[in-house]
Curated annotation (Swiss-Prot):
UniProt name for this protein: Ribonuclease kappa-B
Superkingdom per UniProt: Eukaryota
Main enzyme class: hydrolase
E.C. number(s) listed in UniProt: 3.1.-.-
Similarity comment: family membership: Belongs to the RNase K family.
């Protein structure tokens, strides 16, 4: 029978911890970008043309903030998937301990 086990117990536990931290961090960043936090303006990909040549500069900046927040939420979802994979690996490692060879 083919085993889906590809990680050891320590690597799987590390994957869970990193996934939980990544989800928390990225969701908080996504929320802060979504409310247009001024502290995070350095991380918004805008050019001088977006600020000075655009007839409605705040709308363009708000769209850029929201795009970055969506990217953070997508990355958090990917971390959730990887955390689920790590959790499955932990369960498979536990089951392997009880199997008789």
């Amino acid at each position: 029978m083919v085993s889906l086990l590809c990680c050891g117990p320590k690597l799987a536990a590390c994957g869970i911890v990193l996934s939980v931290w990544g989800v928390i961090m990225l969701v908080l960043l996504g929320v802060f970008f979504n409310v247009h936090s001024a502290v995070l303006i350095e991380d918004v990909p805008f050019t001088e043309a977006d600020m000075f040549e655009d007839p409605n500069p705040p709308a363009k900046m708000y769209r850029l903030y929201e795009q970055v927040s969506y990217n953070c939420f997508i990355a958090a979802a990917i971390y959730i998937v990887l955390g689920g994979f790590s959790f499955c690996q932990v369960r498979l490692n536990k089951r392997k301990e009880y199997m008789v060879r």
